[in-house]
């Protein structure tokens, strides 16, 4: 420690230094140290604080630093009434945010003399508890003992503060030598001496610093990822927290992703179509104009799904009688029309909105057993061994394809699709134009170029044989019995036959049969294809469902459980649903083959069904039932007054269309087309 002669100092300074040195060892034994002896506090003018009495610091305990005032040769420690002591002067320092944040260079001797109000503060569990006596200190296991700590403190206190700013710096530096508990205690002590307005300011600052806006402080991509795990109810609650969160959640991308995740809409093209007319969407389904149209679309779809699942909700119903006692063999519908084929040669087109019969297409000479349309082009296959192409708008038959020698039992339309990438990373699209695939009881499969119908065409293009038909692309031969089912995508055709085999055909290889999949013990009635996973499924009279890799021909799995003919399969995304003559349906995980649910409730063989990943609608004798796919449970009966069979059923997100039979007497029945609309009323 430097001597009194090292620097210019007063006699009182030297005296204070001697006093300090005398007590140094005793304080060090307690882990405390007295400040350096040469602490002469002066002002910027010639008036010195030592004129009233020299003052030095000493640390009395880990939680307390008091001042020692020396007057001539007399030293008085801890005098609470001494107006020159630092503790008293500091307590009278004006405590305002400006004073705290922007220290001035006001001399220490110019501190204001305004008394302050001592305010009791609550003591949270994380804060030190105020002791009963003012001088009681917090004891902690850590100690200031050690030459390094003592020397550091002496170095900090070697420069005397001459301004308010320097004093604040000194206190800040000294507080760094305290333990965490004692630092908390020091803050608590200072807050006790703080005015109410300043406490209010501190409260606001602390509250703001403790708030962490997770959504706003992370990259937008991370925010969207976080939101993707929330359901719509939680999102709506979060949106009410603040305007910033509302703006984030009101982003259309948030709700488009939610539409897909909740399987309300999974096709981007459908979402784009639905959002084409946002004004109409907002007008019909929202009362809040500031909500984005994607959120309103989610609301619309969610309300409609909930109506489906609510047994108390009664959909708008239209019943149409129009086929006598004939069997409806095939059915397809959209928002404008319902198209039915029956076993009496006719094809009927009804209005979906009103149920009115709009057109009857005549020309086939036998029952219609297969139909499918795309756009305005309808294709039908009949027991008369012909395929007909129709313009539905005009009702005109535009083409007749001949070549099959027996009933056309199944057909499919393959649209252009991306099937891979070339060497340059560009999409490979196949086919170039829509293809029509027809399967017949003559064992063969025909591949046709689908004609584009023209409203101005008023004649029928008829081709008597295979060789003079420019639309015929290939004849796929190989099955030895009736072709019962066809599923196609891109360049691949999967066919199931009564010969108990499944065949894989590659149109990029001139329609060559790449694999004959053998494994079933009886007739194959149904097929499904998942092109991207190179997987196909087949259902058979042997009661099994076989899962194949159509690229390698490998039998991957056999799904067992049904007790009779598996006549129907439907694959949507990763959900495979099977329906059998044992009166049950089963829901399978298409990737793993795991059985998710067994749907029991029908009293007879399942004659028709469809699913969309959320709902299954199934029909059997006298029953039309709705099931929840996710839960694997029965939801409701859609019709309760059917007295005969359910011939066909199809549905979209808002309507269910079924062809049903009502028994009039023992020998007579009547077929009806039932249209159930769950989108009415628009708002409820």
UniProtKB/Swiss-Prot annotation:
The gene that this protein is the product of is CDC4
| Keyword Cell cycle listed | yes
Q: What is this protein called?
A: Cell division control protein 4
Can you give the residue ranges of the F-box domain? 212-258
Q: Where is the composition biased (Low complexity)?
A: 1-17, 64-77, 116-131
**Source species of the chain:** Candida albicans (Yeast)
Task: Give the matching PROSITE patterns.
Answer: FBOX (PS50181), WD_REPEATS_1 (PS00678), WD_REPEATS_2 (PS50082), WD_REPEATS_REGION (PS50294)
Give the highest taxon in the source lineage.
Eukaryota
WD repeat ranges per the UniProt record? 322-351, 363-391, 403-431, 442-468, 478-506, 519-549, 561-589
